Curated annotation (Swiss-Prot):
Enzyme Commission number: 4.2.1.-
Pfam families documented for this protein: Scytalone_dh
Subunit structure: Homotrimer. Each subunit contains an active site, located in the central part of the hydrophobic core of the monomer, which functions independently.
Family statement: Belongs to the scytalone dehydratase family.
InterPro entries to which the protein is assigned, alphabetical: NTF2-like_dom_sf, Scytalone_dh
Keywords from the UniProt entry: Lyase
A GO MF label: lyase activity
Active site per database record: H84, H109
Gene3D superfamilies found in the cross-reference section: 3.10.450.50
Enzyme class name: lyase
Native species: Metarhizium majus (strain ARSEF 297)
Protein name: Scytalone dehydratase-like protein Arp1
Length: 174
């Protein structure tokens, strides 16, 4: 019987499948549940956005990662709604304390004219593969980074995020 390599914040990978990180982090990101997302983060993350024209951080602190993703110029924009859907997935065990998840991903985004979310301004969706890194930290599996590779975008994806993804110059961490 195949062993599940799905990392979990609640169980060891040897005890069986769990939805805690492989599914819940996407629910948290899409629902903007920042506290719950923060709880599954490793102390430092590898963040490589070079394949989507942005920067790479070999060791970004969890606090800096949270500041980046929750920033008003990125996913913290109250006028942006998003849902990240995971498709096909396979797991690569690097060591007893490190796993790489290879995920097919569709990220749907809708931007509204105001935070009341009544009038849609634009849509932008991305189809990608994503490497997600997981490490065991303090005996618990944690999300330790990502490396997306966009296959193609729909609609006006490049206009969804007013800061992080629409400006050509390098952005510094908040």
């Amino acid at each position: 019987m195949a062993q599940s390599l799905t990392p979990s914040v609640e169980t060891d990978s040897k005890t069986g499948p769990s939805k805690a990180i492989s599914f819940q982090d996407y629910l948290d990101l899409s629902a903007l549940d920042w506290a719950r997302l923060r709880a599954v983060l490793a102390p430092t993350l590898y963040v490589d956005y070079t394949k989507i024209g942005k920067e790479k951080w070999d060791a970004m602190s969890a606090d800096d990662f949270m500041a980046m993703v929750s920033n008003d110029d990125f996913l913290g924009d109250l006028c942006v709604k998003t849902q990240h859907l995971i498709g096909a997935t396979y797991w690569e065990r690097v060591s007893e304390s490190k796993v790489i998840g290879h995920h097919q991903l569709r990220a749907a985004h809708q931007v509204y004219t105001s935070p009341d979310l009544k009038t849609v301004k634009l849509r932008g969706h991305s189809h990608a593969t994503n490497e997600h890194y997981y490490v065991k930290s303090g005996g618990v599996w944690k999300f330790a980074g990502l490396k997306p590779e966009v296959r193609w975008n729909e609609y006006k994806f490049e206009e969804v995020f007013k800061g992080s993804y629409t400006q050509s110059e390098k952005q510094s961490l908040p």
